Regions:
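Histidine- and acidic-residue-rich, metal-dependent catalytic cores
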Residues: 1-160
Length: 160
């Protein structure tokens, strides 16, 4: 409201988002200090003041996450052989996107969907293996195959 009233129409949404995060550093201050009804001791006040630095650090740490999340959101439909949305090939596809592509497709196949039944673990792993070197980075398919028992434990409750 203030940003718009002050003529900052283009920045209003960004300012609103920043307003939601400005006190995130209070998560690092003990709750008994944050909610103390009386006067703070000097040490408690120093802890409250530190929330600004804590918040800045949390946001700084999130920057890498957002940078990589942007890349993986764009590239998770790339295929090892270049047949993906952006046409990148092999190791030109960001490592994290290659890993997420394997996990995303395996999870999609192993999960019930409104338009189809879930696949069995053996069918899923056979499909993933068949797509190694085409759709998926072969290295990460090998890793997926090593996770068969873990996948069985994760998805066994969903077997019908």
């Amino acid at each position: 409201m203030l940003a718009i009233e002050g003529g900052l129409h283009e920045d209003a949404a960004l300012i609103e988002a920043c307003a939601l995060l400005h006190d995130i550093g209070k998560l690092d201050v003990p709750p008994e200090i944050i909610s103390k009804p009386g006067k703070l001791t000097p040490a408690e006040f120093e802890a409250v003041k530190a929330h600004a630095r804590f918040g800045a650090q949390r946001i700084h740490d999130a920057i890498r996450l957002l940078e990589v999340a942007e890349i993986t959101a764009l590239l998770h439909h790339e295929k090892w052989d270049g047949a993906g949305y952006e046409g990148l090939v092999g190791e030109n596809i960001h490592l994290f996107a290659r890993i997420i592509a394997v996990a995303d497709v395996a999870d999609a196949l192993l999960s019930e969907r409104v338009y189809r039944a879930r696949w069995s673990l053996s069918d899923t792993l056979a499909y993933m293996q068949a797509e190694s070197g085409k759709h998926f980075d072969p290295q990460w398919i090998e890793v997926l195959m090593r996770c068969e028992d873990k996948l069985k434990n994760m998805y066994e409750g969903e077997e019908k």
